[in-house]
Every structure is written in structure tokens, then in C-alpha cells.
Amino acid sequence: MSYLRKAISSLLKVPDTPERTAFGFAIGVLIGFSPFLGLHTVMGVAVAFLFRLNKIAVMLGVWSNVPWLVIPFYSFATWVGVKVIGLPEGIHLPSIEFSDLFRTEFWIWLGSQWQLLLPAFIGSLLLSVILAAIAYPTALWVVKKYKSAV
């Protein structure tokens, strides 16, 4: 069984109301796509316990930001942040090709661009709220559909 099927199966079998399950999942998505890289799991566990949310649903939401989404998501989030608050003074964004990701020069350049942290933070915060707002009704619909069929 694939990872995605196992995750969906776990979410659907959570012994809770569809609303609480969907809310927990949406909060997990909010945390999982937040700008706090490296803290997502700890934050998910803490929030689930602190607010007595469904822990399985929260963690599945947190882990929906899988490793292969990190670079595309946070790149897009930085772009969104730049569109919202503007490009910091003195920063010039070059055209980047996919093949550049495999060049040492690109990573050296990227490491010197710490001024992009604020746009990345703002962009990922905005996108995580949007994704959570989409996740709640979607998860609610799926869980209700499953529970009515069982």
C-alpha cells in the first residue's frame, strides 16, 4: 500500500467526529507549510496536546509537506512574499534553470541571500493559511463521505 493510501486510510479511520478530524488535519497543514522549517513535527505534537486536537489528524496534516515539496513550495513562497512586500534593496534575482540546482555556485549564491528570509517567511505564512483553508472543507467532505459509506 502506498504512503498516500496509508495516510488517507489512517485519517479516515480516526475515531472522532468528521469536523474535529478535518479541523485537526487543517491545523496540521497550517503548521506543516509554515515557515518554521525543522520545527513542524514538534509544533504539531505540542499544538495537538495543548488544544486537545486529534493527534493523528494533526500529524498527517503536518506531514503532508513531504520532502520533495520543500524546494518548490518555499521557492514559490519566497516569490509570493516578494510580490507582497517587495524585493529587499540590493537584491537581484537571476533567472534560475533547474540544472542550476546541481551546481555549487548556485548554492553558494543562495547562501548569501539571507535578505530573502522575510519574503520567504511572509509568503509561506500566507500560503500555509490558504492551504489550511482548502484542507478543512476537503478533509471534511472526504471523511463524511467515508463515514457515511461505512
Which stretches of residues belong to each language-model region?
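Short, Lys/Arg-rich, polar N-terminal cytosolic tail immediately upstream
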Residues: M1-L12, V150
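Small-residue-enriched transmembrane helix starts and helix-helix packing motifs
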Residues: A7-L30
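Residue-level signature of transmembrane alpha-helical entry/exit and packing/kink sites
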Residues: R20-G24, V58, L116, A120
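Transmembrane helix boundary and interhelical junction motifs in multipass membrane proteins
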Residues: S34-V47, F51-A77
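Juxtamembrane non-transmembrane "cap" segments at the membrane-aqueous interface
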Residues: S75-R103
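Membrane-interfacial segments
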Residues: V84-E89, T138-V150
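Membrane-interfacial helix-loop-helix junctions in multi-pass membrane proteins
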Residues: F102-L118
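Transmembrane alpha-helical segments in integral membrane proteins
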Residues: P119-K144
